[in-house]
Curated annotation (Swiss-Prot):
GO terms for biological process: aggregation involved in sorocarp development; positive regulation of gene expression; sorocarp development; sorocarp stalk cell differentiation. The gene is padA. PANTHER family: PRESTALK A DIFFERENTIATION PROTEIN A, PTHR43162. This is Prestalk A differentiation protein A. Involved in development and cell differentiation. InterPro entries: Ergot_Alk_Oxidoreductase, NAD(P)-bd_dom, NAD(P)-bd_dom_sf. Belongs to the NmrA-type oxidoreductase family.
Amino acid sequence: MQTNITSTKMSILVTGGTGVVGRQVVKSLELREKNINIRVGGRDQDKCNQLGFGKNSTFTRFDFMDPTTWDKSLEGVDRVFLIALPMDPTPEKSLGPFIEKCKERKLKKIVVLSVIDAERVPLVKIEQMVQGSGLTFVILRPPFFSENFSEGFMKHDIDQGTIRVPVGEHSVNWISTHDIGECASIVLMDSKFDGRTIEITGPKPINFKELSEVVSKNVGKQIRFEDIKPQEYKKCLMDRGISEPSANYLNELFTSAREDKLSKCTKGVNEITGHDPRSFEQFAKETFSNTSGSCTSKPVI
């Protein structure tokens, strides 16, 4: 695949660098380019050490809620991968001032991880801030991550044996964080995608009845799907300790799913990487153990 990658040594800050997406961005950057410095932004250095990043990757303490960590994290950095805190109902309060800090430092590029149908959730405000910043940007819009079932908000349902969500017979085109990480690493370094908002999806949508059958096969126990009402789903989330604003955020995403906004199939991953994305079936086969009869997920690397 033809790329337009500069030979100048880059320094990239990956926010959320030890998270489910950020770690994939770091690992993909390490694989693609040796002549870069990678700052792994996070709050837990021990977790960073356990992930086994390469010698070009260095942990830096970074917290959107602690502006005193920003200057040191951005020192010498010319590009940033920007990801909001999970299910943050007001990302503009923390990311907005950070984007202003990036403007002050005249960064060369910001790559933002958003979501398909971002207009329904607060992430659209972050898109607008970056688009109006005057900085070079790329916005990536995925649907739900497949890894939500192994270490995200859907893992609870798998552990309990029943996927209970307000989605009916509608489908979602799940995407693996491996593909997101690879896409992000490329657009961070390659100028030909600059200024674009790109929707990236898996290869095909799958409804939740089909999905539960795929997971059952690979987990080694029966996983049921139960369609529930949005208000019941909100209560279930809050009973698990998820805040009401975050529960509302997730409900909005499932509204997008019921309107078939998350079932679209785009060529975004192929356009950026030159290969097709992983399917949900491939994710399930690679991720879940089927030897114990329980939902045990392998580490996502």
